[in-house]
């Protein structure tokens, strides 16, 4: 039974992280996709708990108006849970953060750990991400979840990485690297 889908709202990102494998092919097909039609089908056929992730080939918050349209469309579907993962560099207004909270969106910030580790692959964005994490907490009263990409450096410093995340008291998903600096995609299967 299918219980989740991931939807990429775009193929654009405001960063160029050294380990990102989504843009290795050079040009990405940015053919239009009717996201609302996909959501219409999910609403019609998912008669059970269902997860929708707005993640993938780009930074979803670059298309925040489209994300808001999708969330409004799903307002009458309490069995559908929504999450998104952002690189954390797009500043959101208090109103936008409250909108995400009111629509029960689990917002995950991509954060690889302490500053030196994060900045090593994520374009020196640690300070900006942490400001947005703090703003999210100030508005919602809780920290977002985190998604950390695991590579050799984080494995060599795992205690430091874990110690970095512990004070937040929230869920951290550790994802392995695929592509240039991780295992080849062919070996992942």
Predicted regions and their residues:
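Short acidic/His/Gly/Ser-rich catalytic and metal-binding motifs that mark active-site loops
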Residues: 15-19, 117, 183-184
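The substrate-binding groove and active-site-proximal loops of carbohydrate-active enzymes
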Residues: 26-29, 58, 119-122
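A C-terminal junction/extension of Radical SAM enzymes
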Residues: 181-189
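Canonical Radical SAM [4Fe-4S] cluster-binding loop centered on the CxxxCxxC motif
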Residues: 1-35
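Radical SAM/AdoMet-radical enzyme domain recognition
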Residues: 35-55, 63-181
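Short acidic donor-binding/metal-coordinating loop in glycosyltransferase active sites
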Residues: 9, 57-58
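Short coil/turn segments at secondary-structure boundaries
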Residues: 4, 58-62
């Amino acid at each position: 039974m299918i219980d989740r889908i991931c939807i990429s709202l775009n193929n654009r990102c405001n960063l160029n992280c050294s380990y990102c494998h989504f843009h290795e092919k050079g040009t990405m097909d940015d053919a239009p996709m009717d996201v609302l039609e996909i959501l219409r089908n999910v609403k019609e056929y998912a008669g059970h708990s269902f997860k929708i992730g707005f993640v993938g080939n780009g930074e979803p918050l670059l298309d925040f108006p489209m994300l808001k349209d999708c969330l409004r469309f799903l307002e009458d579907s309490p069995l559908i849970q929504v999450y998104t993962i952002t690189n954390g560099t797009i500043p959101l207004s208090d109103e936008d953060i409250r909108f995400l909270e009111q629509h029960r969106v689990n917002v995950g910030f991509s954060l690889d750990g302490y500053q030196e580790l994060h900045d090593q692959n994520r374009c020196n964005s640690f300070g900006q991400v942490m400001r947005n994490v703090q703003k999210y907490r100030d508005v919602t009263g809780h920290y977002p979840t985190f998604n950390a990409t695991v590579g050799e450096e984080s494995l060599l410093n795992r205690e430091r990485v874990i110690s970095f995340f512990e004070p937040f008291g929230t869920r951290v998903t550790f994802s392995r690297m695929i592509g240039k600096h991780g295992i080849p995609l062919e070996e992942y299967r």
